[in-house]
Amino acid sequence: MAMKPEVEQELAHVLLTELLAYQFASPVRWIETQDVFLKDFNTERVVEIGPSPTLAGMAQRTIKNKYESYDAALSLQRQVLCYSKDAKEIYYTPDPADLAPVEEPNAEEQTGAAATPAAAAAPAAAAAAPAAPAARPVAELPDEAVKASLLLHVLVAQKLKKSLEQVPMSKTIKDLVGGKSTVQNEILGDLGKEFGSTPEKPEETPLEELAETFQDTFAGSLGKQSSSLISRLMSSKMPGGFTITVARKYLQTRWGLGSGRQDSVLLIALTNEPASRLGGEADAKSFLDSMAQKYASISGVDLSSASAGASAGAGAGGAGGATIDAAAFEELTKDQKVMARQQLEVLARYLKMDLNGGEKKFLQEKNTVAELQSQLDYLNNELGEYFIQGISTSFSRKKARVFDSSWNWAKQALLTLYFQIIHGVLKNVDREVVTEAINIMNRSNETLIKFMEYHISHCDENNGENYKLAKTLGHQLIENCKQVLDMDPVYKDISKPTGPKTNIDKNGNIKYSEEPRAAVRKLSQYVQEMALGGPLTKESQPTIQEDLTRVYKAINAQAAEHNISDSTKLEFEKLYGELLKFLETSNEIDASATTRLAGVVDDDLDKDSTKEVASLPNKSEISKNVSSIIPRETVPFLHLKKKLPSCEWAYDRQLSTLFLDGLEKAAINGVTFKDKYVLITGAGAGSIGAEVLQGLVQGGAKVIVTTSRFSKKVTDYYQSIYAQYGAKGSTLVVVPFNQGSKQDVEALIDFIYDDEKNGGLGWDLDAVIPFAAIPENGIELDKIDSKSEFAHRIMLTNILRMLGSVKKQKSARGIETRPAQVILPLSPNHGTFGGDGMYSESKLSLETLFNRWHSESWSNQLTICGAIIGWTRGTGLMNANNIIAEGIEKMGVRTFSQKEMAFNLLGLLIPEVVNLCQRSPVMADLNGGLQFLTDLKEFTGKLRGELTETSEIRKAVSIETALEHKTVAGANADAAFAQVEVQPRANIQLEFPTLKPYETVKKIGSPDLEGLLDLEKVIVVTGFSEVGPWGSSRTRGEMEAFGEFSLEGCVEMSWIMGLIKYHNGNLKGRPYTGWVDSKTNEPVDDKDIKAKDESHVLEHSGIRLIEPELFNSYNPEKKQMIQEVVIEEDLEPFEASKETAEQFKHEHGDKVDIFEIPETGEFSVRLLKGATLYIPKALRFDRLVAGQIPTGWNAKTYGISDDTISQVDPITLFVLVSVIEAFIASGITDPYEMYKYVHVSEVGNCSGSGMGGVSALRGMFKDRYKDQPVQNDILQESFINTMSAWVNMLLISSSGPIKTPVGACATAVESLDIGVETILSGKAKICIVGGYDDFQEEGSYEFGNMNATSNSLDEFDHGRTPAEMSRPATTTRNGFMEAQGAGIQVIMNADLALKMGVPIYGILALTATATDKIGRSVPAPGKGILTTAREHHGNLKFPTPLLDIKYRKRQLKNREAQIKQWVETELEMLKYEAEGIPAEDQETFYAERTEEIKREATRQLKSAQAQWGSEFYKNDPRIAPLRGALATYGLTIDDLGVASFHGTSTKANDKNESATINEMMKHLGRSEGNPVLGVFQKYLTGHPKGAAGAWMMNGALQILNSGIVPGNRNADNVDKLLQQFEYILYPSRSLKTDGIKAVSVTSFGFGQKGAQAVAVHPDFLYAAVDEATYNAYVAKVTAREKAAYKYFHNGMIHNTLFVSKEHAPYSDELEQPVYLDPLARVSSDKKTGALVFNGKGIQSSSQFVSEENRKTATIVSELAKKTAGTDASGVGVDVELIKSINVENDTFIERNFTEAEIAYCKKQPSVQSSFAGTWSAKEAVFKSLGVKSQGGGASLKDIEITREAGKGPEVVLHGAAKEAATKANVKNVKVSISHDDFQSVAVAVSEK
């Protein structure tokens, strides 16, 4: 077992303490030390290595005080230095300024004649280039022919893509190419083409010698190859018209260079080729100037004289040249201009053209434009800029978002709730849980109930209190859902009403909060509070005394009117008098109290009880309506008004009774809005409208909501509302809308009413809630501006327009009996607040609709309900007033939370109020009594002033107190109490799987699994990695699971993208270790990286707009094509080389003329009429988005060399990085380590690709066709198997199987299948599998032509961002999103994985591929993979016992007994086989034969394990492959928790794949209500084709190890078509489960490729091994994890994650012997530590016959000898399989072994092997006694095997065994024991 972390930490602490103690306790003796090196050794240079000059300072003081005169006498000059500040002096680094030559610049040089030194910078430095001479040419230098050495040097450097300085002439070509034979052949071919014949083996000759050899026969001129390269350089990188002739002329006139020297300059230019075509002639000349200077420095030529001559000439010309007067020149050329003009006019008249037509048209247009501009200016001045900009249209039908998949969100909400309880996030049933229960009930259906029943029935209460709570709540919720199954959904809010609270702390900070109201704990009580009103809303209430007086007067009046008898009057008078007397004398009754009655009901929802959930479906009877407690002469806080004849609105008790009673019903039992169609505007986040929206969708309404800020963030907000609250039958539509635009208003209503076939919704509105508004704060009467007018338009004009449009649509459709109820947003603010522009006027003007409803003709289409909205806290308009709300309430006014006001407004939609509105307009006062508060403005100002004053006083007191405290106690008095914040540090983990305690593992898997499986037939994934749009598998996993990067994720992404790098050394003169910014070299702390880089990382990762710099400048908006054109006129001539000119002639024949240019030897080429040209053109391509690797990703960051990067296709780099990261994830830091465990032939590579090296293919076809430079070996990089070849050549050096699948988009899963088959067949034990593909414009264009990919322009039109264009399983999915990258897994058999101690991420239980049916469409999706569920059901009554793991285990036990018997028999028979063997060979014979028997027994056992463990279902028609694969590990189809979908976001695939998975589950009998969780990874990554399945498998393995199932975050609305697939759930957010047992991965590729893989949690493998094996494995994995962690972080720091191998693990001499010995293994070289093959171990017999087996052979040979003698009367042989001894069975151990035996066995390294050996000995002893057996269950405790130090095992008999031996005359029993990791063998001999 591994050492526990606590113990390690304790030991480290002790060690550190001891080291420090030793250091402090030991004397330093520094003075003596100084004397030694200063005096004894006379040291002159002292260097301190450390962070600061501590010792150096002491040494300097010592020298000055003690050795100054001593040094003077000896002439010693000492130097004391410190590494941290004197690095330059220590390393003798000169200052760059000192190296610069000191020259006296002349006047010409000071004006800019110096040439730019660097070719690469030439274009940028064009401005600084020397001006061309204006006068005579420069003096020519003596010409010199080009030298063979320069020509050779350039050709080699150019081919290697290096500068001349990087190619030393002392090296050979073979050395320079670094083993790249293809490049070497190219260079030799170029040399042959250039120089003719070449000497023998030129590649092995140093370039210096080779140049001398060439010089002997060299003619001194450029050859074919160099001329061709120069010609290509000029044509591809120089500006148009800048030909070789022009260049040579410039070099001759500017620098005085002859043709030979010009050749040399042009040759040098080949190794400094510009990256792109130069912009103009000045750039080209600057480039040539820099090349000339470079040539001068190489050849030693001085160009300054030429430069000076040119400058002098220019100066002379400028000073003494002839000049001409401008007027004279004009006079000279006047006649020429007149004649030219006359000729032009003659031609114009002939062609009937008006030369001044354009000018005339321009003047007309100018006038028109001026007139239009005048109108615009007028409108701008009149309406204002804000108004004009504000009325712009934003509505678009295409951008409408429709949310209606409540059926899916219900299951997701249930699972979220379930797992939150399981994980302890929710520990009791509070109001949040009850609210969620209501939402679930509102979505209740049969499928949902089955879903709940399954999960609750499988919730084991024994797992803890959380599971118990989940089960209890679940049962109640199920019953609730059953009860409301046929009921309509209801809006029911059970949240606690809150009130405002403003506090000012001691430091003067004003803090506002919402706190529950003490007496109002639920909405039913809230309604009561509203009905009662407050002191401010009531008139003075009568006392009891006053009421009695009124009653007395009323009775007297009645008596007088009805002639009541006097006796009755007297009796009444008497009673009344007694009552008054009683009240006067009573001390208990207060006659002055009011007669108002009120009651408060306790809140039973505050209790932690699940009973509330159980009571939810019950419709409570309201015995006493709230209206009964409305006090007389009191106006409720909420009430309805009626219109008086005076046209004023007054409180109406009867109407208010209806309203409040309806509100009470809604609060207690809820209210439904089913089949209601509602339009709501102004429902942004934090508004009243948003709360109203929640209530509407919760009640089942169909709602269209508008937003003026349409964006992904906004639509996600509304989607989250629907996902949480949307009830069955509800719909939410979100559209962009500007209520200030008339066009938008009309378009919106048209959209609502248009038929669906016309792109509309086909709705008829039942309610309109136009709440849109904008604030106008601070605008008084004299400041009414453009914004105020626009606000008025929004809040009044366009509301009227909107209502008019609704009326128009209803009338057009003849809708007269279904009026839409309009909830008008009125306000109590009738100028009361002031300073709010035209807000009050807008609200007041809406009230005219109450009259117009009667006076106009639209009462059958619209009803009016005005809502005077009171003080609502927290909204955008009132947020600033929150702090004074508490003060307002103290005055008797009731302010409202947003939820309360939303509840009030939704109460206006109840049937009672709707019916009232249909009779007459209704005015609802929801003001809370605010209208009764006079001088509101003054009062609010006073409240705010008091708060401000109190705050400022407390602030001042706080500051004064702090100053006083510091003065008294000191400035640092609080230092001890200061809060210390621990800053986070990034700690990137490799995420090795968590290994549970063995006891936990055994509980997870079936106990019968142990020993059942042949682990060599179990394939596991031990490492995985990827390179993709989100970086590595770690960073992609973070983004997929959590939707954001952690600190570690940001650090890794920043490193990947080259934003940061690691620094260790001096930085700005001080030592620094840590991250630095790659651009600025400034230090960056870990904690700051996320804040600094995250926005850049997110912008340049994932799915995004195509970045041209990543794809050879490919810009889809300017995709280049070529078109063939036949020219109709002769073209102007251009210049080309002779070779090129002849090629033109060869192609065009007589359609081209070519002539040599004598001066340069170049040719003039002229294309004639009829010649054919291919002319480039650009088109706008509509696929603008793709999943791209992070910008800045560079293989060099990982350690891949520049040579490799320049040589291979980019996809190969992705693969190399992925492979090395997969090995690191496997804990393998040196790939050669594999050969310690397997032969080189047993490591295979089965990875593949859909297209392979597309960049190479592009080079082969497109670039080669365009005659652009392309490496000659480009062909090899295009092969799909080349990537695997590079992996082997640079990393692995294996000789195992290589299989390269090509399965289009299913390649990676096909690779898995091939890899698994390769290992199972025995051809390999370790395989690299996976897939990879690139993204390039060619593939993108062709996918677009197939309409397979997402149309970016169409997506933009629909308002989608690039990140959401891949939307699998959604209603709006519209094509897949291409991506690029690689994904790799390392797989091996489980036996090897356990032995190596590599991490196991998952078991590959099933891999399969399948084709589809007859068809004519290659990409058409099919269901062939459904065959993995093929299973015959028929009418069979009984299931096959093979699926019973206990049955299979029993069969295996029987077979093990047979194998045991066979081994014993074979061992006994060896004595007969050995009879003919010479004595000297007998030992070898027994060793080899016993090894053979053991191996055969092992084979038989493994065959039996395969038969009963993992292959029992194969070819059995009753067991589907999928069912059998799961049953192997004791799992059923119900245990398949997750299905990772291919999910490409195409209409066809997502439906077909869902149907396939659903039918699989259904056919195999998956339980109803148990859907698999669907994972759709491509929403995040896009579709990388070949890598798709690999990324999905990586994600599946992460799911198994984390239990987190990622959601499809782009699934805004799941397609209704998918609702029919009841066995699939489509989550949109991640779910943290309590564990996933198995995951299915499906993949579909163009070309009839379907594939599936199932990964099972590794715990089910661990359950199949014994405890000792598991614990040993845990220790190995722990060690590997530490080593891998260290290697990974060192690799990041030093950019050495990838270290390519320079040599194979064997020498050339050992290559063939290693290949031919399957038992050859590597070992560590004693000198270098490298893992290499040693010749001594090859073909060694010790590799075959193990040392353990030799002991067995000795025992068996001794047995043969003893049985051949006469002294042996009894012999017993027993063989036991190690695994067959169950050491965990305490009963078995205690019954058969003595305490001494048990103690001995438990001390041994392998406890199970020791027990097995002892048991074998006991059995052998029993057999040797020759007595009758007492049965298989008899105890063997009486036979004791003792062991003494230095002695072998001895037999001690007790009890019955001793008696039996005595009866059989046995005097002594000897026994020998041998065991290995497979079996134990014991031989016992009884002596008589």
Curated annotation (Swiss-Prot):
**Domain spans labelled Ketosynthase family 3 (KS3):** 1119-1657
Q: Which CDD domains match?
A: elong_cond_enzymes, KR_fFAS_SDR_c_like
Q: Does the keyword Isomerase apply?
A: no
Q: Which residues make up the binding site for acetyl-CoA?
A: 1774-1776, 1800, 1810, 1819-1829, 1843-1846, 1873-1875
Q: Can you tell me which residues form the catalytic site?
A: 1305 (for beta-ketoacyl synthase activity), 1542 (for beta-ketoacyl synthase activity), 1583 (for beta-ketoacyl synthase activity)
Quote the record's binding site residues for Mg(2+).
Answer: 1774-1776, 1874-1875
Q: Which Gene3D superfamilies match?
A: 3.30.70.2490, 3.40.47.10, 3.90.25.70, 4'-phosphopantetheinyl transferase domain, 6.10.140.1390, 6.10.140.1410, 6.10.250.1930, NAD(P)-binding Rossmann-like Domain
Q: Which domain of life is it from?
A: Eukaryota
Write down the chemical reaction(s) this protein catalyses: acetyl-CoA + n malonyl-CoA + 2n NADPH + 4n H(+) = a long-chain-acyl-CoA + n CoA + n CO2 + 2n NADP(+); a fatty acyl-[ACP] + malonyl-[ACP] + H(+) = a 3-oxoacyl-[ACP] + holo-[ACP] + CO2; a (3R)-hydroxyacyl-[ACP] + NADP(+) = a 3-oxoacyl-[ACP] + NADPH + H(+)
Q: Which InterPro entries match?
A: 4-PPantetheinyl_Trfase_dom, 4-PPantetheinyl_Trfase_dom_sf, ACPS, Acyl_Trfase/lysoPLipase, Fas_alpha_ACP, FAS_alpha_su_C, FAS_alpha_yeast, FASI_helical
O-(pantetheine 4'-phosphoryl)serine occurs at which residues?
181
**Which GO terms fall under biological process for this protein?**
long-chain fatty acid biosynthetic process
Q: Can you supply one Gene Ontology CC term for this chain's record? A: fatty acid synthase complex
Does the keyword NAD feature in the UniProt annotation? yes
Domain Carrier span(s) in chain numbering: 146-221
Please list the disulfide bridges. Answer: none
Entry EC number(s): 2.3.1.86, 1.1.1.100, 2.3.1.41
Question: One GO molecular-function annotation for this sequence?
Answer: holo-[acyl-carrier-protein] synthase activity
What are the entry keywords?
A: Fatty acid biosynthesis, Fatty acid metabolism, Lipid biosynthesis, Lipid metabolism, Magnesium, Metal-binding, Multifunctional enzyme, NAD, NADP, Oxidoreductase, Phosphopantetheine, Phosphoprotein, Transferase
Residue ranges of the region described as Beta-ketoacyl reductase: 675-874
Q: Name one Pfam family in it.
A: ketoacyl-synt
Q: What does this protein do?
A: Fatty acid synthetase catalyzes the formation of long-chain fatty acids from acetyl-CoA, malonyl-CoA and NADPH. The alpha subunit contains domains for: acyl carrier protein, 3-oxoacyl-[acyl-carrier-protein] reductase, and 3-oxoacyl-[acyl-carrier-protein] synthase. In this species, higher amounts of C18 than C16 fatty acids are produced.
Q: What is known of its domains?
A: The N-terminal ACP and almost all of the KR domains play an important role in determining the carbon chain length of fatty acids produced.
Family note: Belongs to the thiolase-like superfamily. Fungal fatty acid synthetase subunit alpha family.
Subunit structure, per the record?
Fatty acid synthase is composed of alpha and beta subunits.
The protein depicted here goes by the name Fatty acid synthase subunit alpha
